[in-house]
Amino acid sequence: MNVYLRKLFPHDLTHEVSITRKIIELFFNNQTKDLRFVRKGCVNGRVYDVIINDATDPRFGGEFKEIYKEDLAKQGDILIIKEREDGCYELSVAFEGTLIHDRIKGVFEGTERHAIVDILLLGNY
């Protein structure tokens, strides 16, 4: 099973988060509407409605930023998104300085911010 990793840059904290067409194709199976997200470990059961806008270039819209802002994500943290069996996408944040962040940060070189990796790379996340 693959997960999508998205490294956060300053712009992502104030604007919509960009995504590539390749990620949309390979990870989201070209689905851009009616995406349902949940926060990993969230017990209130809230489901966030997300879309992928494509006015100039693809960007997450809808309630996407609300998900990771509740976790107080910041520049340099990495979003981890995986698809659950029920079709929802589960989002968690790998915070800088944590074991999981240290394990996965090496997949990004320079200003790269998108990666799809095998979930086995994450270990017991």
Feature locations, PLM:
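Acidic, low-complexity intrinsically disordered regions
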Residues: 1-125
